[in-house]
Amino acid sequence: MACTTILVGKDASYDGSTIIARNEDSANGEFNPKRFIVVKPEEQPREYKSVISHLTITLPDDPLQYTAVPNADLKEGIWGEAGVNEANVAMSATETLTTNERVLGADPFVEYTPAKGDEPEVPGGIGEEDFLTIVLPYVKTAREGVQRLGALLEEFGTYEMNGVAFSDSNEIWWLETVGGHHWIAKRVPDEAYVTMPNQLGIDEFDLEDALGDQEAHMCSEDLAEFIETNHLDLAVENTTPFNPRDAFGSHSDSDHVYNTPRAWYMQRFLNPYDEVWDGPDADHKPTSDDIPWARQPERKVTIEDIKYVLSSHYQGTPFDPYGQLGDERTRHMYRTIGINRQSQLAVMQIRPYRPQASRAIQWMAYGSNPFNTLVPFFPNVDTTPAYLEDTTTRVTSENFYWANRIIAALCDGAFRSTSNAVERYQEKTGAMGHRLVAATDEQIARLGLTAAEEAAQSAAEEEFEADNVDGDVQPMTPDETIAALRNPEVREILAAANQTMADQLKEETEKLLDSVLYTRSMEMKNGFHMSDF
Protein backbone atom coordinates (compact mmCIF):
# COMPACT_ATOMS: atom_id res chain seq x y z
CA MET A 1 0.00 0.00 0.00
CA ALA A 2 1.01 3.61 -0.54
CA CYS A 3 1.83 4.56 3.06
CA THR A 4 4.03 6.86 5.16
CA THR A 5 5.96 5.77 8.27
CA ILE A 6 7.72 7.53 11.14
CA LEU A 7 9.65 5.73 13.89
CA VAL A 8 10.82 7.47 17.08
CA GLY A 9 13.55 6.04 19.31
CA LYS A 10 13.06 6.10 23.07
CA ASP A 11 15.59 8.89 23.67
CA ALA A 12 14.03 11.00 20.92
CA SER A 13 10.45 10.68 22.18
CA TYR A 14 8.88 13.06 24.67
CA ASP A 15 8.43 10.45 27.40
CA GLY A 16 11.05 7.75 26.83
CA SER A 17 8.67 5.50 24.88
CA THR A 18 9.41 3.72 21.66
CA ILE A 19 6.90 4.90 19.06
CA ILE A 20 6.14 3.43 15.63
CA ALA A 21 3.50 4.99 13.38
CA ARG A 22 2.24 4.54 9.85
CA ASN A 23 -0.53 5.78 7.61
CA GLU A 24 -2.21 3.00 5.67
CA ASP A 25 -3.21 4.48 2.33
CA SER A 26 -5.21 2.53 -0.24
CA ALA A 27 -4.41 2.37 -3.94
CA ASN A 28 -5.62 5.19 -6.17
CA GLY A 29 -9.35 4.92 -6.76
CA GLU A 30 -9.88 2.59 -3.79
CA PHE A 31 -11.09 3.19 -0.24
CA ASN A 32 -10.75 0.44 2.36
CA PRO A 33 -13.01 0.55 5.44
CA LYS A 34 -11.06 -0.63 8.51
CA ARG A 35 -11.85 -2.30 11.83
CA PHE A 36 -9.92 -2.16 15.13
CA ILE A 37 -10.13 -5.62 16.72
CA VAL A 38 -8.63 -8.04 19.22
CA VAL A 39 -7.66 -11.48 17.91
CA LYS A 40 -7.79 -14.11 20.66
CA PRO A 41 -5.64 -17.26 20.51
CA GLU A 42 -8.64 -19.45 19.69
CA GLU A 43 -9.55 -17.14 16.79
CA GLN A 44 -6.10 -17.30 15.20
CA PRO A 45 -5.95 -19.68 12.22
CA ARG A 46 -3.69 -22.72 12.40
CA GLU A 47 -3.78 -23.25 8.63
CA TYR A 48 -3.46 -19.85 7.00
CA LYS A 49 -4.25 -19.32 3.31
CA SER A 50 -3.58 -16.02 1.61
CA VAL A 51 -6.18 -14.67 -0.80
CA ILE A 52 -3.79 -12.93 -3.18
CA SER A 53 -1.05 -15.54 -3.51
CA HIS A 54 -3.06 -18.71 -2.67
CA LEU A 55 -0.25 -19.76 -0.33
CA THR A 56 -1.05 -22.06 2.59
CA ILE A 57 1.12 -21.84 5.72
CA THR A 58 0.89 -24.01 8.82
CA LEU A 59 1.13 -21.73 11.85
CA PRO A 60 2.32 -22.60 15.38
CA ASP A 61 -0.29 -23.79 17.85
CA ASP A 62 0.57 -21.30 20.62
CA PRO A 63 -0.36 -17.82 19.34
CA LEU A 64 -0.48 -14.78 21.58
CA GLN A 65 -3.48 -12.49 21.73
CA TYR A 66 -3.02 -9.31 19.67
CA THR A 67 -4.77 -6.31 18.17
CA ALA A 68 -5.12 -5.72 14.45
CA VAL A 69 -6.72 -3.28 12.01
CA PRO A 70 -8.08 -5.54 9.25
CA ASN A 71 -10.21 -4.65 6.26
CA ALA A 72 -13.96 -4.68 6.80
CA ASP A 73 -14.26 -6.36 3.40
CA LEU A 74 -12.12 -9.52 3.36
CA LYS A 75 -12.35 -10.17 -0.38
CA GLU A 76 -8.61 -9.42 -0.75
CA GLY A 77 -7.56 -10.93 2.58
CA ILE A 78 -7.12 -9.78 6.16
CA TRP A 79 -4.59 -6.92 5.88
CA GLY A 80 -4.10 -6.73 9.67
CA GLU A 81 -1.64 -3.82 9.31
CA ALA A 82 -0.91 -2.74 12.90
CA GLY A 83 -1.14 -4.17 16.37
CA VAL A 84 0.34 -4.97 19.76
CA ASN A 85 0.53 -8.49 21.20
CA GLU A 86 0.39 -9.61 24.83
CA ALA A 87 4.18 -9.60 25.09
CA ASN A 88 4.02 -5.81 24.48
CA VAL A 89 5.55 -6.17 21.03
CA ALA A 90 4.16 -3.82 18.37
CA MET A 91 4.25 -4.35 14.62
CA SER A 92 3.38 -2.12 11.68
CA ALA A 93 3.17 -3.79 8.28
CA THR A 94 3.77 -2.64 5.67
CA GLU A 95 5.33 0.32 3.93
CA THR A 96 5.43 -0.55 0.22
CA LEU A 97 8.92 0.15 -1.14
CA THR A 98 10.57 0.66 -4.51
CA THR A 99 13.46 -1.33 -5.97
CA ASN A 100 15.37 -1.60 -9.25
CA GLU A 101 15.85 -3.92 -12.21
CA ARG A 102 19.21 -5.25 -11.01
CA VAL A 103 17.71 -6.59 -7.79
CA LEU A 104 14.66 -8.11 -9.48
CA GLY A 105 16.82 -9.69 -12.15
CA ALA A 106 18.94 -11.34 -9.47
CA ASP A 107 16.09 -12.37 -7.13
CA PRO A 108 12.67 -12.17 -8.85
CA PHE A 109 9.45 -11.77 -6.95
CA VAL A 110 7.54 -14.95 -6.09
CA GLU A 111 4.24 -14.30 -7.83
CA TYR A 112 1.10 -16.40 -8.00
CA THR A 113 0.61 -18.28 -11.27
CA PRO A 114 -2.99 -19.38 -12.00
CA ALA A 115 -3.73 -22.87 -13.28
CA LYS A 116 -3.61 -23.15 -17.06
CA GLY A 117 -4.68 -26.25 -18.92
CA ASP A 118 -3.09 -29.27 -17.29
CA GLU A 119 -0.69 -27.09 -15.32
CA PRO A 120 -1.78 -26.59 -11.68
CA GLU A 121 -1.65 -23.20 -10.03
CA VAL A 122 1.60 -22.16 -8.40
CA PRO A 123 1.18 -20.24 -5.12
CA GLY A 124 3.03 -16.98 -4.69
CA GLY A 125 4.94 -15.72 -1.68
CA ILE A 126 3.84 -13.69 1.32
CA GLY A 127 2.91 -10.01 1.29
CA GLU A 128 1.29 -7.17 3.18
CA GLU A 129 -1.99 -9.05 3.27
CA ASP A 130 -0.35 -11.72 5.44
CA PHE A 131 2.54 -10.25 7.43
CA LEU A 132 0.86 -9.18 10.66
CA THR A 133 -1.26 -12.32 10.96
CA ILE A 134 1.61 -14.77 10.49
CA VAL A 135 4.22 -12.90 12.57
CA LEU A 136 2.87 -10.79 15.45
CA PRO A 137 1.15 -13.58 17.45
CA TYR A 138 4.39 -15.60 17.60
CA VAL A 139 7.07 -13.15 18.75
CA LYS A 140 8.03 -11.95 22.22
CA THR A 141 10.52 -9.17 21.38
CA ALA A 142 11.02 -6.77 18.50
CA ARG A 143 14.19 -8.62 17.55
CA GLU A 144 12.26 -11.90 17.39
CA GLY A 145 9.82 -10.21 15.03
CA VAL A 146 12.62 -9.47 12.59
CA GLN A 147 13.95 -13.01 12.88
CA ARG A 148 10.58 -14.67 12.27
CA LEU A 149 9.64 -12.49 9.32
CA GLY A 150 13.13 -12.91 7.85
CA ALA A 151 12.85 -16.70 8.08
CA LEU A 152 9.42 -16.65 6.42
CA LEU A 153 10.73 -14.47 3.59
CA GLU A 154 13.60 -16.85 2.99
CA GLU A 155 11.27 -19.88 3.01
CA PHE A 156 8.28 -18.61 1.04
CA GLY A 157 9.54 -15.49 -0.73
CA THR A 158 7.46 -12.39 -1.44
CA TYR A 159 5.75 -10.83 -4.44
CA GLU A 160 6.39 -7.20 -3.44
CA MET A 161 8.89 -4.90 -1.73
CA ASN A 162 7.92 -3.96 1.82
CA GLY A 163 9.19 -2.22 4.95
CA VAL A 164 8.06 -3.43 8.38
CA ALA A 165 8.52 -1.95 11.88
CA PHE A 166 8.78 -3.87 15.16
CA SER A 167 9.05 -2.36 18.63
CA ASP A 168 9.11 -3.26 22.29
CA SER A 169 9.83 -1.02 25.28
CA ASN A 170 13.57 -1.12 24.63
CA GLU A 171 14.12 -0.93 20.87
CA ILE A 172 12.72 -0.46 17.37
CA TRP A 173 13.74 -2.48 14.32
CA TRP A 174 13.04 -1.66 10.68
CA LEU A 175 13.08 -4.49 8.11
CA GLU A 176 13.19 -3.98 4.35
CA THR A 177 12.65 -6.79 1.87
CA VAL A 178 15.09 -7.11 -1.02
CA GLY A 179 13.86 -8.87 -4.15
CA GLY A 180 11.97 -12.11 -3.76
CA HIS A 181 13.80 -13.75 -0.82
CA HIS A 182 16.34 -11.37 0.72
CA TRP A 183 16.01 -8.81 3.50
CA ILE A 184 17.88 -6.36 5.70
CA ALA A 185 16.96 -4.93 9.10
CA LYS A 186 18.40 -2.10 11.15
CA ARG A 187 17.84 -1.02 14.74
CA VAL A 188 16.58 2.55 14.97
CA PRO A 189 19.09 4.60 17.02
CA ASP A 190 17.56 5.46 20.39
CA GLU A 191 18.27 9.16 19.92
CA ALA A 192 16.83 9.37 16.39
CA TYR A 193 13.64 9.30 14.38
CA VAL A 194 13.18 7.67 10.97
CA THR A 195 11.05 8.94 8.08
CA MET A 196 9.86 6.50 5.43
CA PRO A 197 7.84 7.28 2.29
CA ASN A 198 7.27 4.51 -0.29
CA GLN A 199 10.96 4.13 -1.07
CA LEU A 200 13.68 1.82 0.21
CA GLY A 201 15.18 3.95 2.94
CA ILE A 202 18.16 2.51 4.85
CA ASP A 203 21.19 4.48 3.65
CA GLU A 204 24.01 2.89 5.68
CA PHE A 205 24.37 -0.74 6.68
CA ASP A 206 27.04 -2.67 8.58
CA LEU A 207 27.22 -6.07 6.90
CA GLU A 208 29.86 -7.28 9.33
CA ASP A 209 27.54 -6.65 12.27
CA ALA A 210 24.55 -8.14 10.42
CA LEU A 211 26.44 -11.36 9.71
CA GLY A 212 28.14 -11.39 13.11
CA ASP A 213 27.04 -9.99 16.47
CA GLN A 214 23.81 -8.45 15.11
CA GLU A 215 23.88 -5.63 17.63
CA ALA A 216 22.13 -3.17 15.33
CA HIS A 217 21.88 -4.94 11.96
CA MET A 218 20.43 -8.22 10.65
CA CYS A 219 20.04 -9.67 7.17
CA SER A 220 19.49 -12.84 5.16
CA GLU A 221 22.42 -15.23 5.56
CA ASP A 222 23.69 -15.05 1.98
CA LEU A 223 23.33 -11.29 1.54
CA ALA A 224 27.07 -10.59 1.17
CA GLU A 225 27.39 -13.18 -1.60
CA PHE A 226 24.17 -11.91 -3.22
CA ILE A 227 25.56 -8.37 -3.33
CA GLU A 228 28.95 -9.41 -4.67
CA THR A 229 27.68 -11.89 -7.27
CA ASN A 230 25.23 -9.40 -8.72
CA HIS A 231 27.49 -6.30 -8.49
CA LEU A 232 24.98 -4.41 -6.34
CA ASP A 233 27.38 -2.36 -4.20
CA LEU A 234 27.74 0.96 -6.01
CA ALA A 235 30.32 2.52 -3.68
CA VAL A 236 33.25 4.14 -5.49
CA GLU A 237 35.67 3.71 -2.58
CA ASN A 238 36.23 0.45 -0.72
CA THR A 239 36.09 2.32 2.59
CA THR A 240 32.62 3.78 1.90
CA PRO A 241 29.90 2.24 4.11
CA PHE A 242 27.48 0.02 2.23
CA ASN A 243 24.42 2.00 1.10
CA PRO A 244 21.33 -0.22 0.61
CA ARG A 245 19.34 2.68 -0.82
CA ASP A 246 21.76 2.86 -3.74
CA ALA A 247 22.12 -0.90 -4.08
CA PHE A 248 18.54 -2.07 -3.67
CA GLY A 249 16.40 1.06 -4.07
CA SER A 250 15.45 3.60 -6.69
CA HIS A 251 16.06 7.23 -7.63
CA SER A 252 13.40 7.60 -10.29
CA ASP A 253 11.55 10.64 -11.59
CA SER A 254 8.39 9.36 -9.93
CA ASP A 255 10.23 9.16 -6.57
CA HIS A 256 10.84 12.91 -6.82
CA VAL A 257 7.11 13.53 -7.10
CA TYR A 258 5.74 10.78 -4.89
CA ASN A 259 8.33 9.92 -2.24
CA THR A 260 11.22 12.26 -1.51
CA PRO A 261 8.97 15.32 -0.89
CA ARG A 262 7.33 13.50 2.03
CA ALA A 263 10.64 12.73 3.76
CA TRP A 264 11.73 16.31 3.07
CA TYR A 265 8.66 17.82 4.74
CA MET A 266 8.74 15.58 7.82
CA GLN A 267 12.39 16.35 8.51
CA ARG A 268 11.90 20.03 7.68
CA PHE A 269 9.27 20.14 10.43
CA LEU A 270 11.22 18.18 13.06
CA ASN A 271 14.61 19.82 12.33
CA PRO A 272 13.76 23.31 11.06
CA TYR A 273 17.06 24.93 12.11
CA ASP A 274 19.58 22.21 11.31
CA GLU A 275 19.89 23.23 7.69
CA VAL A 276 18.41 25.35 4.92
CA TRP A 277 15.29 23.61 3.60
CA ASP A 278 13.90 26.10 1.09
CA GLY A 279 15.10 27.99 -1.93
CA PRO A 280 17.80 27.34 -4.52
CA ASP A 281 20.55 27.02 -1.87
CA ALA A 282 18.70 24.45 0.27
CA ASP A 283 20.78 21.62 1.70
CA HIS A 284 17.95 19.23 0.91
CA LYS A 285 15.11 19.89 -1.50
CA PRO A 286 11.86 17.98 -2.08
CA THR A 287 13.57 16.09 -4.91
CA SER A 288 16.79 15.21 -3.06
CA ASP A 289 17.81 11.55 -3.12
CA ASP A 290 20.08 11.79 -0.07
CA ILE A 291 17.64 12.83 2.66
CA PRO A 292 18.85 10.87 5.72
CA TRP A 293 17.02 7.72 6.79
CA ALA A 294 17.48 8.64 10.47
CA ARG A 295 18.07 12.00 12.15
CA GLN A 296 18.28 13.32 15.70
CA PRO A 297 15.43 15.80 16.28
CA GLU A 298 16.00 19.32 17.56
CA ARG A 299 13.55 18.66 20.39
CA LYS A 300 11.73 15.63 21.75
CA VAL A 301 9.02 14.26 19.44
CA THR A 302 5.43 14.11 20.74
CA ILE A 303 2.35 12.19 19.67
CA GLU A 304 1.00 15.47 18.32
CA ASP A 305 4.14 15.96 16.20
CA ILE A 306 3.62 12.51 14.72
CA LYS A 307 -0.01 13.25 13.92
CA TYR A 308 0.96 16.58 12.35
CA VAL A 309 3.59 15.22 10.00
CA LEU A 310 1.44 12.24 9.02
CA SER A 311 -1.40 14.68 8.20
CA SER A 312 0.83 17.02 6.22
CA HIS A 313 -0.22 18.67 2.99
CA TYR A 314 2.95 20.81 2.87
CA GLN A 315 1.61 23.63 5.03
CA GLY A 316 3.61 26.83 4.77
CA THR A 317 5.06 25.95 1.37
CA PRO A 318 4.03 26.61 -2.24
CA PHE A 319 3.11 22.91 -2.49
CA ASP A 320 0.05 23.03 -0.18
CA PRO A 321 -3.11 22.19 -2.20
CA TYR A 322 -5.17 24.10 0.38
CA GLY A 323 -2.72 27.00 0.67
CA GLN A 324 -2.39 30.43 -0.90
CA LEU A 325 1.32 30.32 -1.64
CA GLY A 326 2.59 29.36 -5.07
CA ASP A 327 0.16 28.71 -7.92
CA GLU A 328 -2.05 25.92 -9.26
CA ARG A 329 0.97 24.14 -10.70
CA THR A 330 3.02 24.07 -7.48
CA ARG A 331 0.02 23.29 -5.25
CA HIS A 332 -0.47 19.98 -7.00
CA MET A 333 3.16 19.18 -7.72
CA TYR A 334 3.83 16.60 -4.98
CA ARG A 335 1.96 13.73 -3.34
CA THR A 336 0.79 14.90 0.08
CA ILE A 337 1.24 12.81 3.24
CA GLY A 338 -2.32 13.44 4.42
CA ILE A 339 -4.21 12.15 1.40
CA ASN A 340 -7.83 11.48 0.48
CA ARG A 341 -7.43 7.67 0.41
CA GLN A 342 -6.05 7.23 3.91
CA SER A 343 -7.57 4.13 5.50
CA GLN A 344 -6.19 4.36 9.03
CA LEU A 345 -3.31 5.63 11.13
CA ALA A 346 -1.99 3.50 13.99
CA VAL A 347 0.59 4.87 16.44
CA MET A 348 1.99 2.24 18.82
CA GLN A 349 3.57 3.61 21.99
CA ILE A 350 5.32 1.29 24.48
CA ARG A 351 5.98 3.11 27.77
CA PRO A 352 8.72 1.68 30.03
CA TYR A 353 7.64 3.86 32.96
CA ARG A 354 4.29 2.11 33.36
CA PRO A 355 3.42 -1.43 34.56
CA GLN A 356 3.65 -4.13 31.91
CA ALA A 357 -0.10 -4.74 31.87
CA SER A 358 -0.94 -1.18 30.78
CA ARG A 359 2.22 0.23 29.21
CA ALA A 360 1.17 -0.21 25.58
CA ILE A 361 -1.09 2.30 23.84
CA GLN A 362 -2.41 2.04 20.30
CA TRP A 363 -3.46 5.48 19.08
CA MET A 364 -5.96 5.24 16.23
CA ALA A 365 -7.36 7.45 13.48
CA TYR A 366 -9.54 6.58 10.48
CA GLY A 367 -9.88 8.36 7.16
CA SER A 368 -8.06 11.36 5.71
CA ASN A 369 -5.64 12.66 8.35
CA PRO A 370 -5.97 16.44 7.81
CA PHE A 371 -9.60 16.15 8.92
CA ASN A 372 -9.58 13.38 11.55
CA THR A 373 -8.32 12.97 15.10
CA LEU A 374 -5.89 10.59 16.80
CA VAL A 375 -7.01 9.06 20.10
CA PRO A 376 -5.56 6.42 22.46
CA PHE A 377 -6.74 2.90 23.19
CA PHE A 378 -5.20 0.25 25.42
CA PRO A 379 -4.50 -2.93 23.41
CA ASN A 380 -4.37 -5.27 26.42
CA VAL A 381 -8.11 -5.95 26.32
CA ASP A 382 -10.42 -8.76 25.25
CA THR A 383 -12.74 -6.57 23.17
CA THR A 384 -12.58 -3.21 21.39
CA PRO A 385 -15.34 -0.57 21.27
CA ALA A 386 -18.03 -1.18 18.66
CA TYR A 387 -17.60 2.37 17.32
CA LEU A 388 -14.20 1.34 15.94
CA GLU A 389 -14.71 -2.41 15.54
CA ASP A 390 -18.07 -2.70 13.81
CA THR A 391 -17.14 -0.96 10.57
CA THR A 392 -19.25 -2.17 7.67
CA THR A 393 -18.98 -1.73 3.92
CA ARG A 394 -22.22 0.28 4.11
CA VAL A 395 -21.91 4.03 4.56
CA THR A 396 -23.24 5.09 7.97
CA SER A 397 -22.38 7.85 10.41
CA GLU A 398 -22.80 5.36 13.28
CA ASN A 399 -19.19 4.17 13.13
CA PHE A 400 -15.94 6.07 13.35
CA TYR A 401 -14.56 5.15 9.93
CA TRP A 402 -17.49 6.36 7.86
CA ALA A 403 -18.08 9.44 10.02
CA ASN A 404 -14.50 10.50 9.29
CA ARG A 405 -14.86 9.79 5.57
CA ILE A 406 -17.97 11.96 5.40
CA ILE A 407 -16.37 14.79 7.39
CA ALA A 408 -13.28 14.80 5.15
CA ALA A 409 -15.35 14.90 1.96
CA LEU A 410 -17.36 17.83 3.31
CA CYS A 411 -14.32 19.78 4.54
CA ASP A 412 -12.10 19.33 1.51
CA GLY A 413 -14.08 21.73 -0.65
CA ALA A 414 -14.36 24.33 2.11
CA PHE A 415 -11.02 24.04 3.84
CA ARG A 416 -10.77 27.60 5.16
CA SER A 417 -14.35 27.81 6.43
CA THR A 418 -14.20 24.44 8.22
CA SER A 419 -10.58 24.32 9.41
CA ASN A 420 -11.25 26.06 12.74
CA ALA A 421 -13.92 23.52 13.65
CA VAL A 422 -11.64 20.63 12.70
CA GLU A 423 -8.73 22.04 14.72
CA ARG A 424 -10.92 22.55 17.80
CA TYR A 425 -12.16 18.95 17.47
CA GLN A 426 -8.62 17.60 17.14
CA GLU A 427 -7.39 19.56 20.15
CA LYS A 428 -10.35 18.67 22.36
CA THR A 429 -10.33 14.95 21.57
CA GLY A 430 -6.53 14.77 21.85
CA ALA A 431 -6.67 16.39 25.29
CA MET A 432 -9.45 14.01 26.31
CA GLY A 433 -7.23 11.12 25.26
CA HIS A 434 -4.23 12.24 27.29
CA ARG A 435 -6.44 12.89 30.30
CA LEU A 436 -8.06 9.45 30.05
CA VAL A 437 -4.68 7.72 29.77
CA ALA A 438 -3.42 9.53 32.87
CA ALA A 439 -6.54 8.63 34.86
CA THR A 440 -6.37 4.99 33.77
CA ASP A 441 -2.67 4.81 34.60
CA GLU A 442 -3.47 6.05 38.09
CA GLN A 443 -6.22 3.46 38.49
CA ILE A 444 -3.98 0.60 37.36
CA ALA A 445 -1.04 1.80 39.45
CA ARG A 446 -3.10 1.63 42.64
CA LEU A 447 -4.73 -1.70 41.82
CA GLY A 448 -4.27 -4.03 44.77
CA LEU A 449 -1.17 -2.25 46.12
CA THR A 450 -0.40 -1.67 49.78
CA ALA A 451 0.57 1.82 50.94
CA ALA A 452 4.24 0.84 50.96
CA GLU A 453 4.00 -0.59 47.45
CA GLU A 454 2.26 2.57 46.24
CA ALA A 455 5.06 4.73 47.63
CA ALA A 456 7.76 2.53 46.09
CA GLN A 457 6.09 2.53 42.68
CA SER A 458 5.58 6.30 42.72
CA ALA A 459 9.24 6.81 43.60
CA ALA A 460 10.34 4.52 40.77
CA GLU A 461 8.15 6.34 38.24
CA GLU A 462 9.37 9.76 39.39
CA GLU A 463 13.00 8.67 39.18
CA PHE A 464 12.52 7.31 35.67
CA GLU A 465 10.77 10.44 34.44
CA ALA A 466 13.22 12.80 36.11
CA ASP A 467 16.37 11.13 34.85
CA ASN A 468 15.05 10.02 31.44
CA VAL A 469 17.62 7.25 31.37
CA ASP A 470 17.44 3.66 30.25
CA GLY A 471 15.31 1.70 32.65
CA ASP A 472 12.10 -0.14 33.23
CA VAL A 473 9.86 0.27 36.26
CA GLN A 474 8.74 -3.35 35.92
CA PRO A 475 11.46 -5.39 34.20
CA MET A 476 10.27 -8.87 33.26
CA THR A 477 11.12 -11.71 30.96
CA PRO A 478 8.78 -12.04 27.96
CA ASP A 479 6.94 -14.95 29.56
CA GLU A 480 6.51 -13.00 32.79
CA THR A 481 5.18 -10.08 30.76
CA ILE A 482 2.61 -12.29 29.08
CA ALA A 483 1.46 -13.61 32.45
CA ALA A 484 1.17 -10.05 33.80
CA LEU A 485 -0.92 -8.96 30.81
CA ARG A 486 -3.34 -11.85 31.26
CA ASN A 487 -4.82 -10.22 34.34
CA PRO A 488 -8.62 -10.16 33.87
CA GLU A 489 -9.12 -7.32 36.35
CA VAL A 490 -6.64 -5.11 34.51
CA ARG A 491 -8.16 -5.96 31.15
CA GLU A 492 -11.60 -5.05 32.44
CA ILE A 493 -10.36 -1.64 33.61
CA LEU A 494 -8.59 -0.98 30.30
CA ALA A 495 -11.64 -2.06 28.29
CA ALA A 496 -13.81 0.33 30.31
CA ALA A 497 -11.35 3.15 29.61
CA ASN A 498 -11.43 2.33 25.90
CA GLN A 499 -15.23 2.40 25.91
CA THR A 500 -15.24 5.76 27.67
CA MET A 501 -12.84 7.08 25.04
CA ALA A 502 -15.03 5.75 22.24
CA ASP A 503 -18.21 7.22 23.75
CA GLN A 504 -16.64 10.66 24.12
CA LEU A 505 -15.12 10.37 20.66
CA LYS A 506 -18.48 9.56 19.09
CA GLU A 507 -20.11 12.53 20.78
CA GLU A 508 -17.42 14.97 19.60
CA THR A 509 -17.27 13.49 16.09
CA GLU A 510 -21.02 13.89 15.67
CA LYS A 511 -20.74 17.51 16.81
CA LEU A 512 -18.07 18.13 14.18
CA LEU A 513 -20.15 16.42 11.50
CA ASP A 514 -23.11 18.63 12.40
CA SER A 515 -20.92 21.74 12.27
CA VAL A 516 -19.25 21.10 8.92
CA LEU A 517 -22.51 19.90 7.36
CA TYR A 518 -24.15 23.18 8.38
CA THR A 519 -21.22 25.18 6.96
CA ARG A 520 -21.28 23.33 3.66
CA SER A 521 -25.08 23.54 3.42
CA MET A 522 -24.95 27.32 3.87
CA GLU A 523 -22.40 27.54 1.05
CA MET A 524 -24.50 25.60 -1.47
CA LYS A 525 -24.83 27.35 -4.82
CA ASN A 526 -28.61 26.97 -4.87
CA GLY A 527 -29.07 28.91 -1.64
CA PHE A 528 -31.72 31.67 -1.79
CA HIS A 529 -33.73 33.72 0.72
CA MET A 530 -35.85 36.87 0.56
CA SER A 531 -33.33 38.94 2.50
CA ASP A 532 -31.15 38.77 -0.62
CA PHE A 533 -33.28 41.61 -2.01
Swiss-Prot record:
pH dependence: Optimum pH is 7.0-9.0 with Ala-Gln as substrate at 37 degrees Celsius. Activity is very low below pH 5.5 and at pH 10.0 is about 50% of the maximum.
Top-level division of the source organism's lineage: Bacteria
Active site: 3
Catalytic activity, reaction form: an L-aminoacyl-L-amino acid + H2O = 2 an L-alpha-amino acid
InterPro entries: C69_dipept_A-like, Peptidase_C69
GO BP terms: proteolysis
EC number: 3.4.13.19
One Gene Ontology MF term: dipeptidase activity
Keywords, alphabetical: Dipeptidase, Hydrolase, Protease
Function, in words: Hydrolyzes a wide range of dipeptides. Highest activity against Ala-Gln.
Family per record: Belongs to the peptidase C69 family.
Protein name, as recorded: Dipeptidase
Lineage, uppermost ranks: Bacteria, Bacillati, Actinomycetota, Actinomycetes, Bifidobacteriales
